[in-house]
Regions:
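Extracellular interaction modules
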Residues: 1-4, 161-163
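Sec-dependent N-terminal signal peptides
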Residues: 3-13
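Cyclophilin-like peptidyl-prolyl cis-trans isomerases
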Residues: 11, 15-172
Length: 172
């Protein structure tokens, strides 16, 4: 009985969250499929921030070729940002959900249970991140745009020399 109730609850929770989020960036459009069945709080947070226009105009402040691109910090320093909950929220790990391919969308953090508004998109498999960052979606369109962003010239701190921005983020 408890399993049935949990399955019904997760199904209802999933229905409340948009299945796709679109980023119009300086390099083109990226579409993400969210996975609320894997990370309901992270998806709710991401969708809530998108609905508020939080990501509009924010830059990808950290780009490491052969690893990932990171954004979601309104200060552009890698130290800012806040969740819709007004405080950091807990990690959501599933043993069978792994960083096994490029295009994984995950929460950036400063350690355990410190998720806020920052996220990253992998450009290669990154198994060393399993159990360290909450995976909550993946790129379903625009991996070519992710590749363009990945290849932007950066400085010694992995910051793009020319600003790379999320012009507009919205639910599909």
């Amino acid at each position: 009985m408890k399993k049935v109730v949990l399955v019904l609850f997760l199904g209802m929770w999933s229905a409340l969250i948009a299945s796709e989020v679109v980023f119009e960036t300086t390099q083109g459009t990226i579409v993400f499929a969210l996975k609320p069945e894997v990370a309901p709080k992270a998806c709710e947070n991401f969708e809530g921030l998108v609905k508020k226009g939080y990501y509009n105009g924010i830059s990808f402040h950290r780009i490491i070729k052969g690893f990932m691109i990171q954004g979601g910090d309104p200060t552009g320093t890698g130290r800012g940002g806040e969740s819709i909950y007004g405080k950091p929220f807990e990690d959501e790990f599933k043993p069978n959900i792994m960083f096994s391919k490029p295009g994984i969308l995950a929460m950036a953090n400063a350690g355990r249970n410190t998720n806020g508004s920052q996220f990253f998109i992998t450009t290669v498999p990154t198994p060393h991140l399993n159990g360290r960052h909450t995976i909550f979606g993946e790129v379903v369109e625009g991996m070519d745009v992710v590749r363009k962003l990945e290849n932007i010239v950066t400085d010694g701190r992995d910051m793009p020399m020319q600003p790379q921005k999320i012009i507009k983020a919205y639910l599909k």
